């Protein structure tokens, strides 16, 4: 069974570490900095880094790739439509790869960037900066319609899917979620749970899709209360889920 843990990087990034205890091979996701990974390998002799998975081209996700590739000769997987350093395998929508014995389906999810991809294995979603705990990534390259479609695709995965995003943004995202839905009891409960985790210095990830559907405003655009709030914010009737999403995202950008 593959074990997944987080290697903290920078101020709020997580590099996900996937370990196969039977072979002592491991993989990392979005290593924006090589140092945390090299430190872990040094502290865990006998383990070999065999694979590097990259979701998109931003520096805080690829900054350590070349150094790690040089040190370990790991195979680098990344989106075909973005410039990824040292990439060995270019991935397109609906490709399938096998890493550490696990099959991963590749979904292209434009929005945060145009070529952004996610890696999905039954029960596990490695989603970079597309879906966050209680939030979603900023639209640096894509349109609101693209991001809405990408998030709807991810939200349709099984409810028990664990969500491994790459930033510790949960508390600030929940503040926005409460502004959108002040009467949502699930959000209030999650705020308290996350507050306790952070007070103990613990991470708030992974999340899961069932929880996201209850507490993430960007996955709740069809809820009447969310639509009403979005309509209030931009003073018009947002007729589609994509329009509600666009209103929420513009609000969150200034929140």
UniProtKB/Swiss-Prot annotation:
Its cofactor is Zn(2+). GO terms for biological process: methylglyoxal catabolic process to D-lactate via S-lactoyl-glutathione. Zn(2+) 2 binds at residues 60-61, 129, 167. It comes from the Bacteria. SMART domains: Lactamase_B. Pathway: Secondary metabolite metabolism; methylglyoxal degradation; (R)-lactate from methylglyoxal: step 2/2. Binds 2 Zn(2+) ions per subunit. Its EC number is 3.1.2.6. Keywords: Hydrolase, Metal-binding, Zinc. SUPFAM superfamilies: Metallo-hydrolase/oxidoreductase (SSF56281). Zn(2+) 1 binds at residues 56, 58, 112, 129. GO terms for molecular function: hydroxyacylglutathione hydrolase activity; metal ion binding. Thiolesterase that catalyzes the hydrolysis of S-D-lactoyl-glutathione to form glutathione and D-lactic acid. NCBIfam families: GSH_gloB (TIGR03413). This is Hydroxyacylglutathione hydrolase. It comes from Pseudomonas fluorescens (strain SBW25). The lineage of its organism: Bacteria, Pseudomonadati, Pseudomonadota, Gammaproteobacteria, Pseudomonadales. The gene is gloB.
